[in-house]
Amino acid sequence: MTSVAKVYYSQTTQTESRPLVAPGIRRRRVLTKDGRSNVRMEHIADKRFLYLKDLWTTFIDMQWRYKLLLFSATFAGTWFLFGVVWYLVAVAHGDLLELGPPANHTPCVVQVHTLTGAFLFSLESQTTIGYGFRYISEECPLAIVLLIAQLVLTTILEIFITGTFLAKIARPKKRAETIRFSQHAVVASHNGKPCLMIRVANMRKSLLIGCQVTGKLLQTHQTKEGENIRLNQVNVTFQVDTASDSPFLILPLTFYHVVDETSPLKDLPLRSGEGDFELVLILSGTVESTSATCQVRTSYLPEEILWGYEFTPAISLSASGKYIADFSLFDQVVKVASPSGLRDSTVRYGDPEKLKLEESLREQAEKEGSALSVRISNV
């Protein structure tokens, strides 16, 4: 038996200026390659009010540059706001020098005679610097109440800000960035069956506990009633060579989906790389060090699924007995024999009325015993 010549296929890295789509094909994907949503929400009533009602999530999801700008402005704003209040207290009590206080006058706040001095006293009190040059006296009970109110309110504000910063830093999203999916999916024979395969790797030494990979096939679907579902979701199951539901992701693993008669992919044009569907992959697991749930996502368009290829082995053994995962080979594939037992299907797109007419004519031809093939142009 003649062996199949192996030809290495180097993957192309996706960028915004060079997407992984063929020229002339409109880029349409629900999920980007790095797992971000590609959906734009429009015409949401009271959207800003809804975001303000959930301030915690809003601040955590906020980008760092806006978060730092907002919180810096918040601190400076509270210093200035309470500085103005302290200045008004000094005006009401007659502490300003231009008001001509008597020689034995005891001010509410010593050495606060201007708005600048009031601002500095507010800053020193809120940050607990306490230089000692400006201090509150026992003359004004209102000033004592104001100082307590400022410290309580600003302490709550600092707790909220510190909490959002820590929550944003500790999010498992950053851990998810060290989980890598292969740029392409491949279709080849595995254990005598045609399989769609993807490769996943953990680039940290700390493990993910209870890993599970699930898939969602997104495509336009027409019901028997003629209703068009724009993004119909169908589950696509993946497994490793073992029967375990929780693979040991210490080395790069290849996950398989058997494309048989029960597979939702059996009628898709996988060989041609054409069609109107998207395969979304989701890996879920628990971070070993923090026990937080981590989820990694990616998606594959038809042109990102390679027919008749398999992944190049990326695991080797060193002279010292250590296993080596070579990530320079992670995205490389090798040409193999085309998988057998899988028909090259085509998916029809176009006007639903034309598709209905095609189907009815085809059924009629089958009843009449005719081998006539019917196809209506979408022009």
UniProtKB/Swiss-Prot annotation:
Binding of ATP, residues: 210-217
Gene Ontology terms for molecular function: ATP binding; inward rectifier potassium channel activity; potassium channel activity
Residues that coordinate or bind 1,2-dioctanoyl-sn-glycero-3-phospho-(1D-myo-inositol-4,5-bisphosphate): 36, 168, 171, 173
Tissues showing expression: Widely expressed in adult brain, including in the neocortex, the stratum pyrimadale of the hippocampus and the piriform cortex. Expressed by cultured astrocytes and also by cocultured cortical neurons (at protein level). In the distal segment of the nephron, expressed in the distal convoluted tubule, the connecting tubule, and the early cortical collecting duct.
Pfam families reported in the protein's UniProt record: IRK (PF01007), IRK_C (PF17655)
Cellular localization per UniProt: Membrane; Basolateral cell membrane
All ranges on the Extracellular side of the membrane: 89-114, 132-140
Disruption phenotype: In the neonatal period, knockout mice have a significantly lower urinary creatinine concentration than do normal mice, indicating polyuria. The urinary sodium concentration are significantly elevated, indicating renal salt loss, and calcium excretion is significantly reduced. Death occurs after postnatal day 8.
Residues flagged as site, Role in the control of polyamine-mediated channel gating and in the blocking by intracellular magnesium: 158
Intramembrane segments: 115-131
Assembly description: Homotetramer. In kidney cells, it forms heteromeric channels with Kir5.1/KCNJ16; this interaction is required for KCNJ16 localization to the basolateral membrane. Interacts with MAGI1, alone and possibly as a heteromer with KCNJ16; this interaction may facilitate KCNJ10/KCNJ16 potassium channel expression at the basolateral membrane in kidney cells. Interacts with PATJ.
Function, in words: May be responsible for potassium buffering action of glial cells in the brain. Inward rectifier potassium channels are characterized by a greater tendency to allow potassium to flow into the cell rather than out of it. Their voltage dependence is regulated by the concentration of extracellular potassium; as external potassium is raised, the voltage range of the channel opening shifts to more positive voltages. The inward rectification is mainly due to the blockage of outward current by internal magnesium. Can be blocked by extracellular barium and cesium.
Family to which this protein belongs: Belongs to the inward rectifier-type potassium channel (TC 1.A.2.1) family. KCNJ10 subfamily.
Protein name: ATP-sensitive inward rectifier potassium channel 10
